[in-house]
Amino acid sequence: GVTECMAAVEAIRSLCDVPILCTLSVYSDGKCYFDGCAEEAAEVLPGLGADAVGLNCSSGPDQMGTVVRMMKKAAPDTPIAAKPNAGLPTITETGEAVYHMNPEDFARHMHALKADGANLLGGCCGTGPAYIEALRALR
């Protein structure tokens, strides 16, 4: 949650001067799993020393646009990161997570997130080099 991120940023800044990227996993409405919300993170963390704030995991790129826009509106000058999964997985009988979004669809949705205000783009669960290459090809 936001409180943990605040503590982490303050601890890092007290020890060294390195770039800090804070990403959160959130529900589709932007609320964190434990405390706070993505908007609050975008507003508060840069003031403590975070260089960028964003979202990771929790959903696919097709489901992050609203929260990215909320974060950018709350903190227009803060770089916003988006590192979604390759869609929402299905779980096999053996417990394996299978992600169904292919690299091209991932890149297309990521391009939309860029238009929504995300400045730093990457991938989380279910992505790999082919996904980032497809994203790079869309520049």
What are these regions (language model features)?
Residues G1-R139:
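Domain-level signal for soluble alpha/beta catalytic cores
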